[in-house]
Amino acid sequence: MKKIKYFLQFLGIISLFIIFKVIGLTLSRIFSGYLLRLLGPLFRSKKIIHSNLLTAFPDSSEYERKKIIKNMWFNYGQILAEYMFIKDFRKNSNYSKKIIIENFDELKNVNLDSKPVIFISGHFNNFELMAMQIEKLGVDLAAVYRPLNNFFLNNIMEKIRQKHICKKQVKKGVSGTKKLLEHFKNGTSIALMIDQRVSQGIRCNFFNREALTTTIPAQFVKKYQAKIIPVHIERSRNNLFKLKFQKAINFSDDEDIKSITLKLNNILENMIIKNPDQWIWSHNRWK
């Protein structure tokens, strides 16, 4: 039964991709944005989204939460449409010029040739463009990804990611962590999303509630004195993207795994608070 469900989802997405290719990026964003805004509230994740927003913003009004959800689904739809044009964002200057780099000096201030760094972020807006653009800036990069449950779609997505987003893709999990270590020792920087629940993590405050959080960045800091560079991407109303680098974080020797992880969670919180409708709220973060 699950295979049939996944195959039907696969056919639906492929059909949409064909439509996107025919009508072009601008119309695809509008069509897909409104489509997801219409269908999104029907998905099973509806309760999780509402619960997550109440956890993060307990003093928010129902109107404010509904507005965030509505904008999130529209944004989700735009991201879906943009997958069909990832190759263009990679190779076509008319697309890539829509991605503006802010605080590029923060990268220049870190000598990546002598020692790799850990880029940390979350699922903001079209998060796939972050790893793609960092690699295009000349950074030797490995990006961690979580395979899709739908194996029909996952096969396609893995090929898209490896060919057009970031050549060095590392699957999330124990084997992936070993691969990350291998890459890092060979001078490759790491791009890691820290906003999802992980079974191997530690319980750490995130919006004043404990959530299982990855300790991979903290472990690299303690063992290899790795520098952490927070980065996130924002979409403006005219569909320009701003890729924003923050200053590299240096941690003191007396900071432990928990305190480092908490500090990174706090940074992530601030990113979300600034643009709550550009973060994907459908993940069961506090399970």
Model-derived features: positions:
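Conserved beta-strand termini and adjacent loop/short-helix elements that scaffold enzyme active sites
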Residues: 102-104, 144-146, 171-173, 246-248, ...
